[in-house]
Amino acid sequence: DWIVKLLDEKVINNDYLCDMRPDEEFGRATRIAAKALKARTLLYAASPLWNGSFTYSNWKNKVETPGYGYELVSKTYDRNKWVRAQQACSEALQAALDAGYKLYNDLEFYKSNGLKENELPDIPGLAEPNSEEGLTFRKRVFLMRYAVTLEYASGNNEYIWVATKNDDL
């Protein structure tokens, strides 16, 4: 709750961060990245590891924490954690879509690499690889494999927060 509260109070609900960065600031935090971080944090909190099924039941804090006692991890399941996580994920997704982010979905991407349909990846177990459905599936597999390296300037509007290796930043 502390991380989520801090993100809400200091980052998301203030005007410190913009929704998108210009090219020269690519890789720096945005409000969309903060919302995604909040959603990921709440997903972790809702997961079985931290929501009633912690593996080490005798793991305790040596010093009592105000409001929590000696327990570091909740041993009781709380369905509301999943509700909060779902709401945060929906908010982050909608904010990203509203800001212009979208999944890169160009199934003809393979052509930009000079490949022909018969050179698309072979998928073991695919019953009819050259049927319309089979080709669409093979194109999607190719897209998922290689589009992650496609730059924003080339039309990949999927990046929300990335690490850059530019020495100037």
Q: Where on the chain are the PLM-derived regions?
A:
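Structured, solvent-exposed acidic/aromatic patches
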Residues: 1-168
